[in-house]
Regions:
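Loop-to-transmembrane helix entry/capping segments in MFS-fold secondary transporters
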Residues: 1, 122-123, 211-221
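Transmembrane alpha-helical segments of major facilitator superfamily
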Residues: 127-136, 190, 225
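Short amphipathic helix-loop junctions that connect adjacent transmembrane helices
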Residues: 108-124
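Intracellular loop-helix junctions on the cytosolic face of multi-pass helical membrane proteins
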Residues: 1-97, 101-105, 259-288
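Intracellular juxtamembrane helix-capping segments at the cytosolic ends
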Residues: 196-210
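Helix-to-loop junctions at the C-terminal end of transmembrane segments
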Residues: 138-154, 240
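C-terminal ends and interior cores of transmembrane alpha-helices
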Residues: 162-177
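Hydrophobic core of transmembrane alpha-helices in multi-pass small-molecule transporters
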Residues: 180-197
């Protein structure tokens, strides 16, 4: 919520400045990047100062080099997940690669799509994303409702199916003739879906993390969320360079969500996923 709220405030600021001073798209982009640079520098400094000092949880084995030990540890963790957590965690991390790639690219490609296909100005694109960010709030409430009626696995898959459907709708229906109101409605629906997608994803992960591996798997979580983030934009770029309509490119990148849904569908039923994690926790507690 803090992340989406900060993005919304920044968008409102830039829309106000652009409209107030009558800037064109180039000037708006220049000013926004300048503000970004200042804000990021301040946030980095503040975060660095406030970051607590924590003792190392592992020591470097004799004869091992720090440069390579991290890779060795990651490989060992990956093998442990494959061996001990086949029912849920393995499928979650695999699905995460494609799910995050889809969600991240959706917002990136939307800028190109709105400009090239819809003919939106920079201010209109800002309004589009402001609407999307506002709608993440009811999306989060909807996520809580759906997840309470089902489970995180089912809820997360449903959010990705809806996201894919929105991609297909936008790619096939939206154009200059449909007008901006329909595009804004589409943006609102995308915002609701992303507001449903992200908290459900994090809830899913938090409920299946094995005891004692929280810090290490948090790194795995970030790694999996970024490892193929480059692929959907590349697919979109290849299609556009081949003179394929941008709408079909939007549909293509949305298809990565279906891969994530298929992977999650291979996981065990939700009670078995939880039992798999709880069983490992109980074993570790007994050994302690």
């Amino acid at each position: 919520m803090v992340q989406f709220g900060s993005q919304l405030l920044f968008l409102v600021l830039m829309i106000g400045l652009s409209m107030g001073f009558g800037w064109d798209d180039v000037r708006t982009a220049q000013v926004s990047q300048a503000i970004n640079a200042v804000q990021i520098s301040f946030s980095f400094y503040l975060g660095w100062r406030l970051l607590p000092k924590t003792p190392a949880s592992h020591s470097l084995p004799d004869g091992k080099h720090l440069l390579f030990q991290g890779f060795a540890q990651n490989w060992a963790t990956a093998k442990n997940i494959q061996r001990d957590y086949k029912k849920g965690l393995r499928w979650f991390l695999l699905a995460l690669c494609f799910a995050e790639a889809t969600a991240n690219t959706f917002t990136l490609v939307a800028v190109v799509f709105l400009d090239g296909v819809m003919g939106f100005s920079g201010t209109q694109i800002g309004i589009f994303f402001a609407i999307s960010l506002v709608c993440t709030i009811p999306g989060g409430l909807f996520a809580r409702f759906v997840t309470s009626k089902t489970n995180p696995n089912t809820s997360w898959r449903l959010s990705m199916i809806v996201l894919f459907g929105l991609g297909v709708f936008g790619g096939l229906v939206l154009n200059r003739d449909t007008g901006s109101p329909l595009a804004y409605v589409w943006g609102a629906m995308v915002g609701i879906t992303l507001g449903w997608f992200y908290p459900t994803e994090r809830l899913f992960f938090s409920m299946i993390v094995p005891h004692g591996l929280e810090a290490e798997l948090s790194g795995f979580y970030v790694y999996c969320s970024q490892i193929i983030a480059w692929l959907p934009p590349l697919v979109f770029s290849i299609l556009v360079e081949a003179n394929v309509a941008q709408g079909y490119g939007v549909i293509a990148i949305s298809g990565f969500a279906i891969i994530a849904v298929a992977l999650l569908s291979m996981a065990a039923p939700w009670p078995e996923i939880l039992a798999d994690t709880e069983e490992e926790k109980s074993t570790e507690s007994a050994e302690a």
